[in-house]
Amino acid sequence: MDQKQIEEIVRSVMASMGQTAPAPSEAKCTTTNCAAPVTSESCALDLGSAEAKAWIGVENPHRADVLTELRRSTVARVCTGRAGPRPRTQALLRFLADHSRSKDTVLKEVPEEWVKAQGLLEVRSEISDKNLYLTRPDMGRRLCAEAVEALKAQCVANPDVQVVISDGLSTDAITVNYEEILPPLMAGLKQAGLKVGTPFFVRYGRVKIEDQIGEILGAKVVILLVGERPGLGQSESLSCYAVYSPRMATTVEADRTCISNIHQGGTPPVEAAAVIVDLAKRMLEQKASGINMTR
């Protein structure tokens, strides 16, 4: 599927929702104010700001314009300069700040108020707290007994597509991208004439939990939107794991199709929704997912 087809799907889905599709845009570095190298290392600078990300720490550069262009072209840690064999103070502080942000999003909880505000049913895995979630991934792959009963009682049975949202390893990925990915995704699936299950939120879920969900609800395709393990300074990245006719005993990782890096600096959520709709349709047509699908 090429870019033109993706844009057509996005326009079609957004039109059905009564919204205007966003204009196509190229992925660009979000840094600004890169006019010239800056050597000031003010302690008052917000280390998460665009100004801090645009900072060029190379002193007395031979070609300042080359550094400026390089800095504009990537979000990587380039042009930070050195103090002898060591990084400069601001570069080190930014590294530590980004590391702290990544740790925070792993340890944070998705607020119960947020889940209720979205009108989502909330269930959980066998995990009871964040510490256990990080140390016992096997328990995050199974629903607790109460969750199983709740799904049987409150969710649509035997859907063509079941959409599940889970916090995973990034709370920010869910709360930041939810509004831009779930409404167009649900609208696109319904517009395609598919029977769509009741979307719900799984707290402390791991990827393999979608196998049990699919088995309980009799879903043909299960789509799990889960927070990715955050990188330095990027804590908002979402992944989609889609699988056809999952079974706890037989489904393996090669049976899943993954779309990763869903966020404003990667694959935009609205565009990802269109790609996921197309993927679900192809899975149902081919009755397969993962490496068993024909490209």
Curated annotation (Swiss-Prot):
Enzyme class of the recorded protein, top EC level: lyase
GO biological process, one term: amino acid metabolic process
Cofactor(s) it depends on: adenosylcob(III)alamin
Domain of life: Bacteria
Principal place of residence: other
Keyword Nucleus attributed: no
Cofactor note: Binds between the large and small subunits.
UniProt pathway annotation: Amine and polyamine degradation; ethanolamine degradation
EC number: 4.3.1.7
Residues reported in the UniProt entry to bind adenosylcob(III)alamin: V207, E228, C258
Subcellular location(s) per record: Bacterial microcompartment
InterPro entries according to UniProt: EutC, EutC_C
Catalysed reactions listed for this entry: ethanolamine = acetaldehyde + NH4(+)
Recorded family membership: Belongs to the EutC family.
HAMAP family noted in UniProt: EutC
Subunit structure: The basic unit is a heterodimer which dimerizes to form tetramers. The heterotetramers trimerize; 6 large subunits form a core ring with 6 small subunits projecting outwards.
Free-text function comment from the UniProt entry: Catalyzes the deamination of various vicinal amino-alcohols to oxo compounds. Allows this organism to utilize ethanolamine as the sole source of nitrogen and carbon in the presence of external vitamin B12.
Protein name: Ethanolamine ammonia-lyase small subunit
